[in-house]
Amino acid sequence: MNWSNLDDALTAQKVFSDLFFDSSKMSDKQREESLKTLVLALHSEATGIVEAVNYKDHRCADEPVDQSKILYKAVDAYRYILAILNLWGIDGNNFAAALSQKDDFLHYRHKVSGRQWGGQPVALFDMDDVLANFRKSFCEWSSKKCGHFIDPESDEYYNVREFKKIGVNSEGYFKEFMDGHGLVSLERDEQYIGLLNHLKTQGYWIQIITSRPASELACFYDTYTWLRKNNIDADGVAFAAEKFIWLSKQPYYSGGKYFAIDDSAKHSAEYAKHGVKVLVPEKSYNKEVKGLANVVYVPHGEDPIKFIPEI
């Protein structure tokens, strides 16, 4: 057995775990109880790693670091992690993909965490259907799944009507789309990414603000994977269901120069109502904000850069 290969390591650990329990015959409740036991054991082994070094600062005498203990306690901890993955049927490919996503997040967060707003003008970019073409991809995926055409050009923001016709919960579909990592493969909107890059060259602070649910971890990490994969050079990334409230808590809200780019009629109207200029790309579902004070409505296909002087 090759322990340096993740799939082989999972298989080898399962052979040992099967001596004690058969996870395939467990109920979810039994799995939960088994998980508690494994996590407590993992905690014990992780604590054992610390015991290999001089972690008690109040002790005057230092003992030699026990590298052998570090190694073998790390092995024990790793095997408990393998057992946890086996318990819930998480295979090597899924785990490796999650590792890659986490790596994207950590690198992107590290890049932006060292940046601080220094008084420059701010552009607040929405993601879905501004930088990334979410609606088209989601409707195509949904149509294929349910066998019923879900029109991306519906005048409804949440497109509920078409889902109701076939007795489908659109939120359930959305979660399944997210859990299947559909957000990673969204197409770029080259015009609005071009706008972002243009504003960056003009000295703007680029803030990504999305109403995607950060509590859904596949969604959260896929957002960073998409940003990194598509070379989106933002200065900050935020997840907020109420975007104006989020904005009102930022250091540039009082006295700074800023504007937003958002396709949602709800968020655009909220921004505009509170005196924030907002660039709104024309969509089938946001006609009601056209003509509102503080809204610059960009006709479909037009280069948004041309409308910056109106901001």
Kindly give the residue locations of the regions a language model identified.
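Acidic, Mg2+-coordinating phosphoryl-transfer loop and its flanking beta/alpha structural elements
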Residues: A260-P299
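A short, structured active-site edge motif that brings together acidic residues
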Residues: I209-A214, Y224-W246
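Short, acidic loop-to-helix structural element flanking the phosphoryl-transfer center
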Residues: K175, D179-I209, S215-Y224
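Conserved Lys-Pro-Asp/Glu-containing loop-to-beta segment of HAD-superfamily phosphomonoesterases
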Residues: A240-A272
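Short acidic-hydrophobic, aromatic-tinged amphipathic segments that line or gate anion-handling sites
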Residues: V237-A241, N294-K306
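Active-site neighborhood of HAD-like aspartate-dependent phosphohydrolases
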Residues: G119-G172
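Flexible "arm" and connector segments at domain edges
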Residues: M1-G119
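Anion (oxyanion) recognition and catalysis
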Residues: N86, N197-K200, R228, A272
